[in-house]
Amino acid sequence: LSKVTNALVNPLSDKFLKMIIKKDNEWASKLVSKLLQEIDAKPLLLEVEISESTTPQIFNYLKSEEIAYLSLLGISLHNKEHRNNIVPLLLQRENDIILTPEWENEIKIGDKILLACDNHAKDDIEYICQNAYEFYYAITGKEKRTIFKGIK
């Protein structure tokens, strides 16, 4: 019952688990080392789908024929030059699945992404996906100033 529940509640996590059990110990050891080094011993799992309802800022950006990369989700809102504590675990585009995708992978509408991260990174990802000001900063490195436009 718990396997079925997990597959329904966390479908990407379930796919990830089914794929990694086919990998060898060396691959698994490298992944565990990367998780420990870049996050900690208890990373959070975050599933993100690029859609209008869950990631409206990214969705609208991609809909306007702009290009975005997985690295967008790793940007620190404290300092755009830094990456948060995140490890991409899986990228699913329709029926194609990439395990441990690179930051340089382009993201598209409909993509489903599984990330391991800490709480701070999770918060930044949610802000980037849903808040126009934070998204603008993540894309440009500049603060979006529209409230007092033209007033000095």
Model-found features: residue ranges?
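Cytosolic regulatory domains of K+ homeostasis systems
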Residues: 1-152
